[in-house]
Amino acid sequence: MVSSAAGGSAKDGSVAGEKTAPIGVFDSGVGGLTVARAIIDQLPHEALLFVGDGAHGPYGNQSMEAVQGYAVAIGDYLVDQGCKAIVMACNTATAAAYETFQKRYSIPIVQVITPAVRRAVATTRSGKVGVIATQATVDSGAYAREFERLCQRQPECGDVTVLSVACPRFVDFIERGVTTGRQVLG
């Protein structure tokens, strides 16, 4: 766990001194540190509390029920630490627990699937989008549902064809910080 935060605590997420309350960020491992880095770059005066679930991760080959349980335990911890918002920096945790988080916590919940889908829709030239993810994320259909939801609300996105492929070995590369080179290409 990486922490640079201070602040009070309440189960509903309300905190005395909101400016010092941290933003909680979590992932099933250390891959979410890239999300934490982006938050620091965009919001340099905000405190962050990062949780990487090395005890249970990676989540990709586990049941959605198990992942939801791990995610809720982390969410409860972050709220107990006084976080004013939670960033779910894990696709699989988002697929398993985002709706639960929205109902359970009275603080803002940010996840990574919607922004990725928006970017893909905005940048595709062919109308075809490839999604590589864990087996659990692909099986959940979370990306396909989000593409469908977005394209229903924004007809200008046209017909987008989504091809989702599980890449279980990719998680190991991300956790080791390997994002380029021959190792990734196999």
Residues covered by each model-derived region:
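Non-catalytic structural scaffold of enzyme domains
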Residues: 2-186
